[in-house]
Regions:
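A short alpha->beta transition loop at the rim of the catalytic pocket in nucleotide-sugar-dependent
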Residues: 76, 83, 105
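A conserved mid-protein helix/loop that constitutes part of the nucleotide-sugar donor-binding site
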Residues: 8, 12-31, 48-54, 96, ...
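Nucleotide-activated donor-binding/catalytic signature segment of Leloir-type glycosyltransferases, i.e.
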Residues: 54-70
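Aromatic "clamp/platform" in nucleotide-sugar-dependent glycosyltransferases that forms part
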Residues: 71, 90
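A short, well-ordered alpha-helix in the C-terminal region of glycosyltransferases
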Residues: 138, 145, 152-166, 178
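Conserved acidic donor-binding segment of nucleotide-sugar-dependent glycosyltransferases
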Residues: 123-125, 129-136, 145-150
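C-terminal alpha-helical cap of glycosyltransferases
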Residues: 169-180
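Short hydrophobic beta-strand element within catalytic cores of glycosyltransferases
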Residues: 107-112
Length: 180
C-alpha cells in the first residue's frame, strides 16, 4: 500500500455502460458530498452513458466533484494514489480493475453481483466491503465507513494487497474452469 496520506479521491475504471450501474455510484457519492467536501469521485472510461452521466452529475451540482476524464492509458498510475475503489456493477465476472485496485492496496466497495467474481476475491469486512446489487444506501454506508475510520481503511488496504499472492492469473483461470 501507499505510505502516508492518499489522495482524497474515490475511483473506478470501467465502460460507461448500463451494466456498471454508475448512476447508483454517483448517487451514493452525492450522499457523502456534504460530509466529506474534500473528496471527489473520478470515473475513468468511455461509453454510451457519458451524456446521461454528465446530466446526472450536473443535476446534483457535483460538476467539480464527480469527474469523467475518459480513457487513461496510464490507469494504474491514476488509480494507485486514490483513497478507495468502488464498483457498482449489476453483474460482473472477475473485474480486472477491481483486482488491480486491490493489488495496489486500495480499500474497495464492490457490489456482490452475479456471477460472483467479487465474492471469489473479497471477504467482506476483511479485504474490502461487498454491498447488495442496486443498494445505494448500502454503498453509501460502506464508503462512509471507510472514510470515517482510518483504521478500517488501513486494515482493508493491508489485506487487499494480499490479492497479488492469492489470485495470480493462473489461479483465477483454474477457478473459472472449475465453474464452467
Amino acid at each position: 500500500p501507499i505510505e502516508g496520506e492518499r489522495e482524497k479521491t474515490i475511483v473506478t475504471a470501467c465502460r460507461l455502460h448500463p451494466q456498471k450501474n454508475l448512476p447508483m455510484m454517483i448517487n451514493a457519492f452525492s450522499m457523502l458530498a456534504d460530509e466529506f467536501p474534500e473528496y471527489k469521485l473520478v470515473i475513468y472510461g468511455q461509453g454510451v452513458l457519458e451524456d446521461e452521466l454528465r446530466a446526472q452529475i450536473k443535476s446534483l451540482n457535483l460538476e467539480d466533484r464527480v469527474l469523467l476524464p475518459g480513457f487513461a492509458s496510464n490507469i494504474l498510475e491514476k488509480v494507485a494514489p486514490c483513497s478507495m475503489f468502488v464498483s457498482s456493477s449489476d453483474f460482473e465476472g472477475i473485474s480486472n480493475s477491481m483486482l488491480e485496485a486491490l493489488g495496489m492496496g486500495l480499500p474497495a466497495v464492490v457490489t456482490d453481483c452475479p456471477v460472483g467474481g467479487a465474492r471469489m476475491v473479497i471477504k467482506s469486512g476483511k479485504n474490502g466491503i461487498l454491498v447488495p446489487v442496486g443498494d445505494t444506501q448500502a454503498m453509501y454506508e460502506a464508503m462512509r465507513s471507510i472514510l470515517k475510520d482510518p483504521a478500517l481503511a488501513d486494515k482493508l488496504s493491508q489485506e487487499a494487497i494480499k490479492v497479488r499472492d492469492e489470485f495470480p492469473l493462473w489461479k483465477i483461470a483454474k477457478r473459472w474452469l472449475e465453474v464452467l
